[in-house]
A protein has these predicted regions:
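C-terminal beta-signal and adjacent terminal beta-strands/loops
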Residues: 819, 861-876, 899-949
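N-terminal export/assembly leaders
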Residues: 21-118
Length: 949
């Protein structure tokens, strides 16, 4: 988007340049057209950042600097006809900044006052410098080739979320920020903790992450400063290894870049749907302290945050930044919101609460009984599970961040980054509940009946996790002539210690019920008996990722559009996963929970990549990239990518990409899936027959009694993908841009869990037979059986308007439309159209911002389309059809942020969900809302105070 060549280049430096020709000083002769042409400037006084943006727009300059360099600084009015270089010098000197020229229209601003220069626009040229201008080294997501312009249109669509947009959003976590982006789907920690599905009562792996384009989190690669990070220490049965976004404090994030489309040729495995690159802050002048406090309009879900960071410049021109952050959030239970219930009668969908009491073997309720239940349940004996479940876990997070950038010798720099953090998180589930077969002879035994029972006397199921993260990187970089190089070593570690209270041990339950010690009729049970029945369950997970990388980049040969630039590098990695579940889980002695197995695995990998940028003319460029990866146990994988960019007219750019991608099986997937080992009756089919134990339940109704379990699959292969994007970017005038892109991603060999009951041909290893060939068991395992084909559109509109008296107005609108989402569960099956099911097929995010003097006000809106209830195969469920509730309606939420800044201070008020929208969801299994999309807090107020030192 061409307008960002000015506006975004100012708001954040994202550039590397390897200039070999001498660069003139500001105002020197031969500085190019920008220095020679005089411009009638009309720049009102006010914030220095706005004044510089206006100067860049009016003069056609490109200014590069850190955003914190201009924060709190003021500029005087400038209404004169001057050479652009002289005008820039005047603004910079008044603010105590130094200016260095890169070329005729590109300048770098840094701290400190340059030596006094003569006022005339043209000054004597100083001696030519011996090396390139010292511009900070940062890369654009989607390529290893440094770019000299943050706003240059790239072949792949890239969304940039700036620091100012992060602050105006009011989001306090990286997870909240990303899940609000169009085309992103959030995976909430409460949902992730449902280990194995909603029927499993073991809340595990409470990580928070997001995914792009409905392909799941394992197809989205998350990077921090361009490097991979370790996954969350515990693994999710449904989602596998996850990058925990909440482990990265939003206060230390400089910006976020989202590249959509395949990028395995650049970054290797996992980047099939896209890449999210989280860029951390590196430079700051002085100290900055921030205090925030927020609560819902109902006075609950409170959160508070304190952070402090301090940066300085070293004697040799380097930078040091250290920061500390503490975040506290209170738990929000479902009982605090009326809409969080399984009672859907208000929508005509019936009451789905669980009646507690005795049932006969035909499941008829004989009488209600809910001993030990609280008063609000005892009246009706109805268990409303969502009322007991956390809408928001309680959390306490502490983080420490440090950065050092230090020149060692002429042309060689040392960079050290360190990030450490701890997090205590607690979430609550309903009391453990099950259908109990009370043995004959027990005082509460009823003939020919079982008891639907909730263990209220044990208490709710609670999961507490203690997470510790450590990320460190040491890198050297430098220049040799026009060529740049870097070498980096990084270590990433995530450890989770989790404890679950409130579960029931199988053997202890059998013992106390056989002995008649535990009473179901309300007779108080001794605390010692309850403690023996429900022992705490602990587990530990460690995920470690170690990386070594070297790369070089520079000009190769001359082309009509400029020098061809190339980048090449080598990456080595070691991925380690250790999982130590509680012995009771290993022995499958926890009721209604999947059996867990210890994991102690590691995987090594290596990758070699090369990229080249070919500017065949000023209007036509081609990017080529290729990467070869070797993963231990899975051989070699080659991933190419091509990108094209053509500008037939000034301000109009057509672009396209084509790429392949892959994802090697994770260490989690090389193991058995989490399955509850149990006996089951399955219909006898020709594929299953003969069965060792057959039951005839009616005419032509033959069922096999089998043991359900799981196994590993040594023949697992990597998933593969092909993707392309086609689009255009239009910037007819400075200050306005628009882009529209179409994407398609086809993922094959998808790794999915399943068994012979899903498809016997797709899972041939699933059948377990005895020595006579009769079926005795069915094992589930991971196999390469799935396929997904997703197509859609993305757009982005941005505009900036300056007024003489009323300040600056900024408008942005971005959206995503999922035109097609087809899935095939097993080979040969019919493709099912999932677009609009489970999640909306359209989403949009926009804002209008006003800035004048020290004031800033932002009104933002997030809109989501409707969601179909049911499934593509089964359609709308009958109760929903009868009630006319086959589609959950879409919604729009409005937020408001206002801030005022004066020297060294900034105060802001953010109001989330101004209209206090009540969630609505007609999928009766979701308990009244969609945890991936809705914010259960409702209207939320957040007050922030910042002080610069």
């Amino acid at each position: 988007m061409a307008w960002t060549r000015f506006a975004l280049a100012i708001s954040g430096v994202l550039c590397v340049t390897g200039l070999t020709t001498p660069t003139p000083a500001l105002g020197a002769e031969g500085g190019g057209r920008a220095s020679a042409t005089r411009v009638a400037f009309d720049i009102p006084g006010g914030e220095l950042g706005l004044a510089l943006e206006r100067l860049a727009t009016q003069a056609g300059l490109q200014l590069l600097y850190r955003p914190e360099l201009v924060e709190g600084r003021r500029a005087r009015p400038l209404r004169e006809t001057l050479a652009p270089a002289a005008a820039l010098q005047r603004l910079a000197e008044a603010a105590g900044l130094r200016v260095e020229a890169v070329n005729g229209n590109t300048y770098v601003l840094s701290a400190g006052v340059a030596p006094a220069a003569s006022r005339p626009a043209v000054a004597a040229a100083p001696p030519a410098p011996r090396g390139p201008a010292p511009i900070p080294t940062v890369y654009v997501t989607g390529t290893h080739i440094p770019r000299s312009d943050i706003g240059a249109v790239t072949p792949s669509p890239v969304t940039l979320i700036s620091r100012s947009e992060i602050e105006a959003s009011g989001h306090q976590t990286l997870f909240e920020l990303l899940r609000a982006q169009p085309g992103m789907l959030g995976h909430h920690p409460v949902a992730v903790a449902s280990d194995g599905g909603t029927g499993i009562q073991q809340p595990f792996a409470a990580a928070a992450t997001t995914s792009l384009n409905a392909l799941g989190p394992r197809a989205t690669l998350f990077l921090v400063d361009g490097r991979r990070v370790a996954n969350y220490g515990l693994i999710s049965s449904e989602l596998g290894g996850l990058a925990d976004l909440d482990a990265i404090p939003l206060t230390i994030v400089e910006r976020v870049e989202i590249m959509r489309g395949g990028a395995s040729a650049i970054y290797g495995a996992d980047a099939m749907a896209g890449v999210v690159n989280i860029i951390l802050r590196k430079r700051q002048d002085g100290g900055e302290g921030v205090a925030r406090y927020g609560a819902s309009s109902r006075g609950d879900a409170a959160e508070s945050r304190l952070s402090y960071s301090h940066g300085l410049e070293t004697a040799r021109g380097g930078e040091v930044l250290v920061g500390v952050d503490a975040l506290r959030r209170d738990e929000l239970l479902g009982s605090a919101r009326d809409w969080r219930t399984m009672d859907h009668r208000r929508h005509g969908l019936g009451d789905r609460r669980i009646p507690l009491g005795y049932r006969d073997y035909d499941l008829n309720l004989l009488n209600r009984q809910c001993a030990h239940a609280p008063a609000d349940v005892a009246d009706e004996c109805l268990l409303d599970i969502p009322r007991y479940t956390s809408l928001q876990p309680s959390s306490r997070r502490w983080s420490l961040y440090g950065h050092l950038g230090q020149p060692l010798t002429d042309g060689i720099d040392l960079t050290v980054d360190l990030r450490a953090g701890t997090a205590d998180q607690t979430l609550t589930n309903a009391p453990f509940h099950a259908r109990v077969a009370i043995p004959e002879g027990h005082p509460d035994y009823r003939p020919d009946a079982d008891l639907d029972y909730a263990f209220f006397d044990i208490g709710p199921v609670r999961s507490h996790s203690d997470t510790r993260t450590l990320d460190g990187t040491v890198a050297l970089s430098g220049w040799r002539g026009a060529w740049g190089w870097s070498a980096a070593l990084s270590h990433h570690h995530n450890r989770v210690d989790a404890r679950i209270d409130g579960l029931v041990q199988y053997t202890a339950f059998d013992r106390v019920t056989d002995e008649g010690g535990y009473r179901f009729d309300g007779t108080p049970n001794p605390p010692a008996l309850l403690a023996a029945l429900s022992p705490p369950v602990s587990t530990r997970g460690d995920a470690t990722l170690q990386q070594v990388g070297v790369d070089v980049h520079g000009p190769w040969f001359a082309l009509p559009g400029g020098p061809a630039r190339v980048a090449a590098g080598l990456e080595l990695l070691r991925d380690v996963l250790e999982h130590r579940p509680d012995p009771l889980m290993v022995e499958h002695d926890i009721a209604l929970g999947p059996q867990k197995v210890p994991i102690d695995s590691q995987q090594r990998g290596a990758g070699v990549y090369a990229e080249v940028n070919l500017p065949f003319s000023p209007r036509w460029q081609m990017d080529l990239a290729a990467r070869v990866d070797q993963r231990e146990g899975y051989g070699r994988r080659w991933s190419p990518k091509i990108g094209l960019k053509w500008s037939p007219l000034d301000g109009l750019t057509l672009r396209a990409t084509g790429a392949t991608g892959y994802r090697a099986p994770s260490l989690f997937e090389t193991r058995r899936p989490s399955v509850v080992d149990e006996l089951d009756l399955v219909p006898e089919t020709p594929a299953l027959a003969p069965c060792a134990y057959v039951f005839e339940l009616g005419p032509q109704e033959r069922y096999c009694l089998v043991g359900r379990s799981a196994r590993e699959n040594p023949g697992l292969r990597p998933e593969t993908s092909r993707s392309h994007t086609v689009g255009l970017a239009w910037a007819p005038v400075p200050g306005f841009s628009a882009s529209l892109d179409h994407f398609r991603i086809r993922r094959r060999n998808e790794i999915l869990p399943g068994s012979a009951t899903d498809d016997a041909d797709a899972f041939p290893l699933s059948l377990v037979r005895d020595e006579n060939g009769a079926l005795v068991g069915i094992d589930a395992y991971f196999a390469n059986v799935g396929l997904t084909d997703v197509r859609g559109w993305e757009f982005d509109l941005q505009g900036v308007w300056d007024t003489a008296q009323w300040g600056r107005y900024t408008v942005r609108l971005a959206g995503n439309y999922l035109d097609r989402l087809e899935r095939r569960a097993v080979p040969g099956a019919t493709r099912q159209a999932f677009a609009g099911y489970e999640s909306p097929d359209r989403s949009a995010l926009g804002y209008v911002q006003w800035r004048n003097a020290g004031w800033q006000a932002t009104v933002s809106a997030r809109a989501l389309g409707p969601v179909e209830v049911g499934s593509p195969a089964g359609g709308c469920p009958r109760p929903n059809r009868e009630a006319g509730r086959c589609r959950t309606p879409g919604w729009t939420r409005f937020d408001f942020d206002v801030a005022y800044s004066w020297p060294h201070w900034r105060v802001a008020l953010n109001v989330r969900d101004v209209t206090d929208r009540e969630p609505v969801n007609y999928d009766v299994d979701r308990g009244g809302y969609d945890i991936a999309l809705d914010d259960p807090r409702g209207r939320f107020y957040l007050l922030s105070l910042r002080r610069d030192f």
